[in-house]
């Protein structure tokens, strides 16, 4: 799975370095950070709706869209995927105490 994410991220970085006409990724880069952030927000909303509708297939698709747009944002901000992977590795296995976290209000 890590390799799949790496390949996707490398493709996104390649589009940033060498734009292809008609590429959606290049469209996002050309519109800039605000457009990328807007798309992340839209896709996160679609994740919420799919989850509330108990639509597993749609939820998976929308999660992929969120990941893709987050990868575009990382590339836009020149943050390598390795930085994310290192942070995940560092957090993996850490014990987190519920009391250390702020309360989440229910809907």
Swiss-Prot record:
Pfam family of the protein (one): PRA-PH
InterPro entries per the UniProt record, alphabetical: HisE (IPR008179), PRib-ATP_PPHydrolase-like (IPR021130)
Pathway field? Amino-acid biosynthesis; L-histidine biosynthesis; L-histidine from 5-phospho-alpha-D-ribose 1-diphosphate: step 2/9
Principal subcellular localisation of the protein: cytoplasm
State which Enzyme Commission number(s) the record gives.
3.6.1.31
Query: What is its subcellular localisation?
Result: Cytoplasm
The question of whether Amino-acid biosynthesis is a record keyword is answered with yes
* Signal peptide positions (record): none
What is an annotated GO biological process for this record, any one?
Answer: L-histidine biosynthetic process
Instruction: Choose one Gene Ontology CC annotation of this protein and give it.
Output: cytoplasm
- What SUPFAM superfamilies does its record include? all-alpha NTP pyrophosphatases
Which reactions fall under this protein's catalytic activity? 1-(5-phospho-beta-D-ribosyl)-ATP + H2O = 1-(5-phospho-beta-D-ribosyl)-5'-AMP + diphosphate + H(+)
Q: Which UniProt keywords apply?
A: Amino-acid biosynthesis, ATP-binding, Cytoplasm, Histidine biosynthesis, Hydrolase, Nucleotide-binding
Keyword Ribonucleoprotein attached: no
What one GO molecular function would you report for this record? ATP binding
Q: List the disulfide bonds.
A: none
Its family?
Belongs to the PRA-PH family.
What's the protein called, per UniProt?
Phosphoribosyl-ATP pyrophosphatase
The organism named in the record is Bacillus anthracis
């Amino acid at each position: 799975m890590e390799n799949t994410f790496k390949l996707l991220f490398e493709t996104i970085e390649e589009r940033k370095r060498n734009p292809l006409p008609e590429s959606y990724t290049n469209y996002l880069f050309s519109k800039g950070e605000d457009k990328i952030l807007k798309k992340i927000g839209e896709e996160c909303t679609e994740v919420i709706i799919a989850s509330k509708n108990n639509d597993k297939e749609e939820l998976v698709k929308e999660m992929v869209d969120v990941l893709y747009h987050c990868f575009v944002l990382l590339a836009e901000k020149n943050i390598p995927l390795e930085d994310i992977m290192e942070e995940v590795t560092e957090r993996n296995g850490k014990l987190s105490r519920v009391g250390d976290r702020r309360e989440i209000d229910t809907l």
